[in-house]
Amino acid sequence: MSNPNHSALAYMKKMGFRARSGFTLIELLVVIAIIAVLAAMLLPALSKAKEKAQRTQCINNLKQLGVSHNLYVADNNDQIAPPNCGGDSVLTDPTFPAGWLYKPGEALPGVAGLGQSNGPTKGLFYATLKSWSLFMCPLHKTNTDAWVLSSVKFTSYLMNGAVINGRTSFDWRAGDLGKTYRNSAFKGTDMLFWESDELDPGYFNDGASRPNEGLTQRHNSGATMGHFDGHVEYVRWKRYFQLVADPRKNSLWCYPGNPITGR
């Protein structure tokens, strides 16, 4: 019996087919060059797509904070949650009331003899959020010297200090004691939460910030900001610095201008 493979080979030779031995070196180099060009074209687009996805997650985090804020004021006679201000001394003092982010004296390991790290779990918003990850921007790097030196290592977002006082004289003690303005004293378009400058650990010694204490550089040429009505906006640095420098009251310097009457 004849071998069918031999018959097939004979037929292919008869019809003019020839088997190739493989790619030549020049052909391989051409293919590699094409792949390199395509990679150079695609990588920037992929990088932008990844950053956009992470920014979307950050925006969602701020939206969740906005929901928590509005649920809190609805349940507390229009009163805004304490902003967790006052720095390290208040952060470790359990005699002060809980704020939106944490309960003083119960946030850090070993504080007041507790020997545990509760982070934001004792904060007033955690009952709604139920997740540490919602307090952190996915682009916030935790392998930097600034992160190591930060007292508060469980948030990328800070509350606007305007909830306790005006532009030139912030009454941090009022905030420490839980005295804040009512939510109705602000416009829905006023800015409540933002991503502060993560390069300065001093800005993360509590849960609040003055508007002129810097903005993150994580999201290219701007940052995400949460407003009193719950909506979130991507604000470019240029606009942020214009608002900071504006001597008039605006959506960033949004202090009501009247004495606090709450609580």
Please name every model-derived segment.
Residues 8-10, 50, 144:
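Local alpha-helix boundary/kink/capping signal
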Residues 17, 50-57:
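Intracellular coupling helices
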